[in-house]
């Protein structure tokens, strides 16, 4: 594959075939893409050195998880940071198998993997290995966040190694398919782990109304997904006259009791990640990126971008593991914020949003929900969830939610919700018709609700009046999709376009066995989805 780069892991990849020029659509340069491939190859070499199926230490697992997370879309644009990560992986391999580097007759069994072998492979093999790779990249983000809170799972850790080992060897479609579904199985465990970590650390999320108004005076915007970073920043800014506003996937933080107690956690600024270059333009406040999604900043706010953990951008101030946020705090005081309160609105004009309808909150009303379904007051549930993005066509999700019948409830999670989360759809029997369940990893909660409802009605999840309408952009959406497939969930609508890494044969397999279909129009899809449960 004689191209400057090759990457097709995100939904916006050029022509739905792959980014191959001087830079990707996400903004990463060709050299950065090549370094990400080198890092992935080094990770596969590390997995080979461990022999794939062997148990691994916590230290080795953390290196693998950090390395995989670094390659997720919109995480790191910093070549130096990626090179440092590559050396970290190689050092861990040297620690585990020091004799390999000194061997006079190398066997090749622990060599690093050349990713060109994958990109140039038979299209079905490439498709399945890509599903595995992108799935574990997404899962690594969840494992990383759990690890930050000192939660880990030995089975999850070991599977990263097993999956990388599989990618590095010749396999058949028949032997790869079970591993693809196993990514979904292990990701379910990983999301459960993160759910436990978040709720045991910060409390069970509670339905919470969040203002979109930014008060006058100094403030800091926190984006990404990492609740621990937000907690530490709240602690360090307490009493300093600085307000904190969430952005994007940090919105659900407002629902956690331990975080809600901070009076200077005021509200949410902006919408989803792809609007940041417009929303942050000349922003009189610093922005702290705790995870993806980072876009190359415009010059009008580049001096107020701060990164931490695996997020990195050349020239941006990086807050290291000591977590001293003094530079961010000083920048907030220097910029001063707005002179007067600023009333902002969501995409549809709403000035407040509600979050915190996690699985515990919804299931606390389980009897009400069951009775409403039996009486006919609730006729259908829609899970309209997933990533947002810049590609045209994503207004489909806004229109879909607007057009859902008045006797239906829409559940949502992840940043795709910003297309419609400021809408007021009213209530059914005291329950909001639109409920935000949280971040993308809170897909675990949606699954728990679905399973509980199926148990209550004595049926399978596929027999429930429940439909999945998903939007995707990056690799966390891939691992969630694989979890749904592992659970046997059928008739999922996926958009706005299908993944470029799905070959025609693999796509056909998913269509025939799981009923996956691309989104069409809101009207047609609502009609078709509701007909499944007649």
Task: Spell out what each predicted region is.
Residues 43-201:
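Electropositive, gly/pro-rich neighborhoods at or near active sites that engage anionic ligands
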Residues 2-37, 41-45, 55, 178, ...:
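Anaerobic metallocofactor- and corrinoid-dependent redox/one-carbon enzyme cores
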